[in-house]
Amino acid sequence: CYACKQVCPLCYCEQCIVDKSMPRWIDSSATVKGNFAWNMIRAFHLSGRCIGCNECERACPADIPLSLLNRKMGTVAMNEFNYRHGTDVNQPTLIGNYNVNDKEDFIL
């Protein structure tokens, strides 16, 4: 339903990937596959940026504990990439920044 997207202060992309239809990257149907894809993509986009306001959980009609996923992604961002949001206003987002020295051992 994307209620979390509508209420999140950090969802501000001009065109969200779930709204893109050519090509359709994310299945927008209310299925396990579509829900999983949406929540994972959103977690990646917010990794290291979530401010912990928990509005996503408040807005979720399915009571999905989204803050757990967001906190985990923030921890991974810090541990794996030494990235912490809010420390520098000029710092690019985690997924908006490429560093040739980033770890790659998790890539299959």
Residue ranges and their predicted role:
Residues 1-13:
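Long, well-ordered mid-to-C-terminal structural blocks that present hydrophobic/aromatic surfaces
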Residues 12-108:
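Ferredoxin-type iron-sulfur electron-transfer modules in oxidoreductases and energy-metabolism complexes
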